[in-house]
Swiss-Prot record:
Annotated function: Catalyzes oxygen-dependent 5-hydroxyuridine (ho5U) modification at position 34 in tRNAs.
Keyword set, alphabetical order: Oxidoreductase, tRNA processing
Entry's family note: Belongs to the TrhO family.
Protein name per its UniProtKB record: tRNA uridine(34) hydroxylase
Reactions catalysed according to its record: uridine(34) in tRNA + AH2 + O2 = 5-hydroxyuridine(34) in tRNA + A + H2O
Top-level taxon of origin: Bacteria
Length: 287
């Protein structure tokens, strides 16, 4: 039996997340779903998995239940299939932000960030400029270890280790973006949307987010102008441009990402060590 994996997020003002939590938890448990749902004053961020029947019922619930006051009626979901349940339990958490930037919360009532869809972005990258003739720069908003698994060709990568570092690195590197069309991107859209909103707020012009992130881009146009895979935060580790699990894995010992070529190293022992944490590599670095 295939398991349906759903992910989605939406920026919307939520007045009382604590009041929502028990109702959402009860419904998810009744449907036998597992995963995590984050509720914050700025919106919702969710990753859940279950049978086709129950995930369809969950989608209808989120879009139409009176609890949500119509805030999520147009909520779009990214979907993939797996042969087993990727999550071990169902959690509904209350957060200050649905993705942590440590900046004042997004004000959803002011509207979402400008976006570019995958076919349009591919057209821009094919030509080397946008429809107004401005050069296009791709800005990766993910953590460095994710970028190392795969990214867009010639993308800006500021080697951040957590998303809350993003505002500072943008302030330090504004010159890289001047006079260009900036397209921020991430795995599924949430980080690049918040990044685009922040850049607009600090006066950077011609900023877009990639609608739906890398995974939606893969779904609609494949791997054009992209090299490598896309890291995902579940047991699959990484997906290729065909949205299939790749051979990239994570080290059992240190959780470092281990691409196929690194798995050929004698320092990689499945279920134990990798070139990052093997005692021999640590000793060599210390010498």
């Amino acid at each position: 039996m295939s398991i349906v994996n759903l992910s989605s997020y939406h920026f919307a003002t939520i007045e009382d997340t604590a009041a929502w939590r028990p109702f959402v938890t009860e419904r998810c448990n009744a449907l036998g779903l597992k995963g995590t749902i984050l509720l914050a004053p700025e919106g919702i961020n969710l990753f859940v998995a279950g049978t086709r029947e129950n995930t369809d019922a969950f989608i209808h619930y989120i879009r139409h239940d009176a609890l949500f006051e119509g805030k999520f009626v147009d909520l779009q979901f990214k979907e993939s299939l797996s042969d087993k349940q990727p999550f071990t339990r169902m959690l509904v958490k209350l957060k200050r932000e649905i993705i942590t930037m440590k900046k004042p919360a997004i004000r959803p009532e002011l509207g979402r960030a400008p976006f570019v869809d995958a076919p349009t972005l591919k057209h821009w990258l094919d030509r080397g400029h946008d429809d107004q003739g401005r050069p296009v720069v791709m800005l990766d908003t993910r953590n460095a270890f994710e970028v190392d698994v795969g990214t867009f060709d010639n993308a800006l990568d500021y080697r951040i280790t957590k998303f809350s570092e993003f505002p500072e690195v943008i302030e330090q590197n504004r010159a890289d973006l001047e006079g260009k069309t900036v397209v921020s991107f991430c795995t599924g859209g949430i980080r690049c949307e918040k990044a685009a909103i922040h850049m607009k707020e600090v006066g950077i012009e011609n900023v877009y987010q990639l609608e739906g992130g890398i995974l939606k881009y893969f779904e609609e146009v494949g791997g054009a102008h992209y090299h490598g895979d896309c890291f995902v935060f579940d047991y699959r580790t990484a997906l290729n441009p065909q949205l299939e699990p790749s051979k990239t894995t994570q080290c059992f010992g240190c959780r470092a990402v281990v691409p196929p070529q690194a798995q050929e190293s004698p320092l990689y022992v499945a279920g134990k060590t990798c070139p990052e944490c093997h005692p021999d590599s640590k000793a060599a670095r210390a010498a």
